[in-house]
């Protein structure tokens, strides 16, 4: 069974998304490129769009795409408290017809309350680029003996936290329910995401350590004069990899 390929709208760049008229304008490109779904980013939605998510849901359905919803916020806020905005984010995900809501972990503490989505929306936690997204923190969270959210394994973010991605894959693969495919190179004192064709083959080896049937999200730069062709190239590459 080949994995679903999801296109993250942010892969086109914030400026390009704005130039095209917002994330809804990307749906024809993503659908024509043969992708299975789209990841909608909350930070790229205007206030007006947040008030009309059902229209976005209709457009996604018209293009026969699945939807994931990414929110640039954490599951836990200070001192291990569940984010008070969680229910709002779940409602937004439901309104746009998303099947999962992706958050970072945040300031989780052992013994903290474990929220699980009660709607038809799956909750997933991603390793982000902060101190809360280190392998030590993520591994501790997913080592709990209780029902847990799924994991979004971001292949590139381990570079930002100074962790070894291969070690992370060996430890966490059985928790992974969504993969963000990303390659990066050094950039000043940090890292910069690059297209897979510009990267070495280490991303292939890492991807092969992760569950082969889980959805793969394109979260590296998609740029060029023909966005459909560029997107299709990577959709096909990741589907066959």
Task: Say what each PLM segment does.
Residues 1-33, 46, 97, 135-150, ...:
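Histidine-acidic metal/acid-base catalytic patches
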Residues 1-80, 87, 94:
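N-terminal pre-domain/capping segments
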Residues 11-13, 42-44, 73-75, 105-109, ...:
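Active-site-proximal loop/turn and secondary-structure-junction residues that shape catalytic pockets
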Residues 39, 68-69, 102, 124, ...:
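Conserved beta-strand positions in the central sheet of alpha/beta enzyme cores
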Residues 59-67, 71-150, 160:
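Active-site acidic/histidine proton-transfer and metal-coordination neighborhood
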């Amino acid at each position: 069974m080949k994995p679903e390929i999801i296109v993250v709208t942010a892969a086109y760049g914030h400026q390009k998304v704005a130039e095209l008229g917002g994330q809804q304008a990307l749906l024809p490109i993503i659908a024509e490129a043969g992708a299975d779904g789209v990841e909608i980013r909350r930070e790229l939605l205007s206030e007006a769009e947040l008030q009309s998510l059902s229209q976005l849901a209709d457009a996604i359905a018209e293009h026969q795409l699945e939807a994931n919803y990414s929110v640039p916020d954490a599951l836990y806020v200070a001192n291990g408290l569940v984010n008070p905005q969680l229910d709002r984010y779940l409602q937004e995900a439901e309104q746009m017809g998303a099947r999962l809501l992706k958050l970072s972990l945040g300031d989780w503490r052992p013994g903290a309350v474990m929220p699980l989505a009660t709607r038809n929306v799956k909750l997933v936690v991603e390793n982000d680029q902060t101190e809360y997204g280190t392998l030590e923190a993520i591994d501790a969270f997913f080592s709990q003996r209780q029902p847990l959210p799924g994991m979004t394994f971001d292949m590139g973010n381990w570079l930002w936290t100074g962790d070894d991605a291969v070690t992370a894959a060996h430890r966490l693969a059985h928790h992974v329910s969504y993969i963000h495919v990303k390659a990066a190179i050094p950039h000043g004192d940090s890292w910069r995401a690059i297209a897979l064709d510009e990267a070495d083959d280490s991303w292939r080896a890492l991807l092969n350590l992760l569950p082969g049937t889980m959805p793969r999200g394109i979260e590296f730069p998609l740029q060029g004069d023909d966005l459909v062709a560029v997107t299709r190239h990577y959709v096909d590459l990741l589907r066959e990899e």
